[in-house]
Amino acid sequence: MAQEGIAKVYNQITLLGTAQDAGRPQLGCTQKCCEDARCNTELSRMPVSLGLSGDNFGIVEATRCLTDQINLMGNTSISEIWLTHAHLGHIEGLGQFGRESLNSKNVKLRCSNSVVDYVMEHPIWKKLISRGNLTFANYSSDQVEPIEVPHRSNDFDTHALLFKGENNNVLFLPDHDTWEETLDLVGYDNPLDWFSSLDASIVLLDGTFWDDNELKNRVQSQVPHPTVNETIKLLGKRKEGDPRIIFVHLNHTNPLHYTDSDQYQKLHNMGWEVGEEGMEFLL
């Protein structure tokens, strides 16, 4: 597990949000899931994001809840931002670095080349670069390894991020389309073999939907994600030597938001976990 020789900038990861891009409750949703969250703030959730602590402070994803998420970290000054991809829910918080808010100076923006191109094609985001609020930086380091995964790649690509440390390697994979495509791309037959090849002891994994029947007013196949139900069939019960697998990026409809649901209990009994805001992971 130890990663000797790594230039260690970060020594801890904090989970700053666990929901899908729009959070919970969602605008316009009148279903029980969001009405419950409006009535009971303990059921509200911020979009998925990570705080990176150590010699510097960084974040992964810039969500609409950026201000509240940074407050969870003591309102620390941000040195860099890592992006997995450029769907709106993962980048809309970038505007907070502009003149209307922080007016930051040369905060590093670490993203893939196709995301760089996407940012520079949009006047709002491009201004953040031209005004010096953000500056592009390398999309890898001794401690952070991007791994490309398939996820609706018409405009830009998507990556998982592997954070390497002396105590744990943490894989962050909040979005991908299907296990078949992802495993084919990375060259493994099942998720656990892939995680083992990365020496990942903690996996923060796409848990968007529990099953294929959650979206009542949309065609769910147009929002591709492996369901949790499918994923745990591939994983089976957790065995000695398996990594901690923690499901994040939960859609507002996902029954895993309720700790007393049958689905939550099934997952828990198999040895897997649901992410909670404020969880900390030592690197």
Region locations from a protein language model:
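Core dinuclear metal-dependent hydrolase active-site scaffold
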Residues: G5-M73, F136-N190, F195-S196, M279-L283
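Residue-level marker for beta-strand->alpha-helix junctions and adjacent short loops that shape enzyme
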Residues: Q20, L88, V116, W210, ...
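Active-site metal-binding motif and surrounding structural segment of the metallo-beta-lactamase
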Residues: D55-R110
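Residue-level marker for buried hydrophobic side chains located in beta-strands
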Residues: G58-V60, W82, V170-F172, V203, ...
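A short alpha->loop->secondary-structure connector
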Residues: T76-I78, S101-K105, W125-A137
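Short internal beta-strands
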Residues: V107-V116, L204, I246-V248
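A short, active-site helix/loop in glycosyltransferases that binds the activated sugar's phosphate group
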Residues: N113-W125
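Cap/insert and terminal regions of metallo-dependent hydrolase folds
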Residues: N169, D177-G278
